[in-house]
C-alpha cells in the first residue's frame, strides 16, 4: 500500500474514533436510567440522557429525589453520558 493510502487509512480511523460515542461499557450505569421527576413539586427544567436516542433531552424535575440521570447543563450530560 502506498504512503498516501496509509495516510488516508490513518485519517479515516482517527475520524471514526473521534466520532464514535462511548460504549455502554464506558458509560456510567445511571445514564441508563429513565428520568425521574422526584417527589417534590417544583417544575425545574433539567437535562437527562436518553439511552434509546443516544442524546441528552429535556425533562422537568420536581426538586428532590429522583436519580443521577439529571444534569443542569447540556455539556455536563454530553460529557458524562454521550462522550466527547
UniProtKB/Swiss-Prot annotation:
UniProtKB keywords: Disulfide bond, Glycoprotein, Hemostasis impairing toxin, Protease inhibitor, Secreted, Serine protease inhibitor, Signal, Toxin
Tissue specificity statement from the Swiss-Prot or TrEMBL entry: Expressed by the venom gland.
Intracellular or extracellular location(s): Secreted
Chief location: secreted
Glycosylated residues (UniProt): 70
Leader sequence segment: 1-24
GO function term, MF aspect, one: toxin activity
Domain BPTI/Kunitz inhibitor, first and last residues per copy: 31-81
GO cellular component, one term: extracellular region
Keyword Membrane: no
Tagged with keyword Ligase: no
Feature type site, description Reactive bond for trypsin: 41-42
Stated role: Serine protease inhibitor that inhibits plasmin and trypsin.
PANTHER family per the UniProt record, alphabetical: KUNITZ-TYPE PROTEASE INHIBITOR-RELATED (PTHR10083)
Family: Belongs to the venom Kunitz-type family.
UniProt protein name: Kunitz-type serine protease inhibitor C2
Source organism (scientific name): Daboia siamensis (Eastern Russel's viper)
Amino acid at each position: 500500500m502506498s504512503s498516501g493510502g496509509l495516510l488516508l487509512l490513518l485519517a479515516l480511523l482517527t475520524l471514526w474514533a473521534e466520532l464514535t460515542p462511548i460504549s455502554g461499557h464506558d458509560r456510567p450505569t445511571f445514564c441508563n436510567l429513565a428520568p425521574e421527576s422526584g417527589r417534590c413539586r417544583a417544575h425545574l427544567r433539567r437535562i437527562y440522557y436518553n439511552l434509546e436516542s443516544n442524546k441528552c433531552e429535556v425533562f422537568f424535575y420536581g426538586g428532590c429525589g429522583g436519580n443521577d440521570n439529571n444534569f443542569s447543563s447540556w455539556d455536563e450530560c454530553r460529557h458524562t453520558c454521550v462522550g466527547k
